[in-house]
Amino acid sequence: GTGSRGNSTLLETPNAKVLIDQGFSGTQLAKRLARLQLTPEDIDCVFITHHHGDHGGGAKVVQTKWNIPVLANERTALELDLVPELTTFFEALDLVRVGDDLAVLPVPVPHDGSDNVAFVASHGGERAAIITDLGSWTDELVAHVRGCEHISIEANYDHNKLMYGPYPYSLKDRISGRGGHLSNEQTGRFLAEVCTETTRSITLTHLSEKNNAPHLAESTVLYYIDEVFTGDLRISAQNGPDFSHYVGAETAASPEKSPLN
């Protein structure tokens, strides 16, 4: 599921099961995994993008309740007060290997006074990008995401709904600022830069319940990528898991699986 009330994405290969973010309670996480015929004990580790509660608020509970290792950068780990014995720090742009068939690259992105990162996961010669909570992007991010077979990215708000909505000006300014979130138009422009003929699927995530709507996100993004993308575009809901995308060798059971999105 993705949204302001919690975020988590499952990456599954034949030899690894990894969560990207854990913003749910332990009970909620267990319920959502059960819908995939999984338990928390099946999870090998959790990667955290940044310390905000809807992304990392449930990270410590997986350590204390199920002894699941968590990987985060140092600031994120300290902000979340993670259990030292079950925490591994990573550095931006240092490739992290999980088992023998999954590699995860953290790529820095700007967001609200946090050391936020996107992740580019590699399996079977193909790549999946998970990008959330950023108000702008860098050439570095474009370079690492371009040509990924799957891209999961936030489309947080519709500009008009945000600006004419009930939020105070200070909050509107923060959301729409360079360290805030991506609008539907920004997401469309970013995707137009990174989509290639190899890009098969896109998932739009983290839609604001007050400042966006699925049909607005989809139509706006498609306007920008219609000439460069012919694959599968889906929108992730807060109450997921909804669906899966597969990346990697066709013989693999589920090389990249994002049903918690």
Where are these regions (language model features)?
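Active-site neighborhood of phospho(di)ester-bond hydrolases with catalytic His/Asp-centered motifs
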Residues: 20-23, 44-51, 71-74, 129-132, ...
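Cap/insert and terminal regions of metallo-dependent hydrolase folds
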Residues: 139-237
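Active-site metal-binding motif and surrounding structural segment of the metallo-beta-lactamase
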Residues: 25-72
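Metal-dependent catalytic neighborhoods of phosphoester/phosphodiester hydrolases
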Residues: 57-66, 77, 81-82, 212-219
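Active-site environment of divalent metal-dependent phosphoester hydrolases
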Residues: 52-56, 77-79, 114, 136-139, ...
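Metallo-beta-lactamase
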Residues: 72-125
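Conserved beta-strand hairpin/beta-sheet module of binuclear metal-dependent hydrolase folds
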Residues: 1-36, 117-132, 150
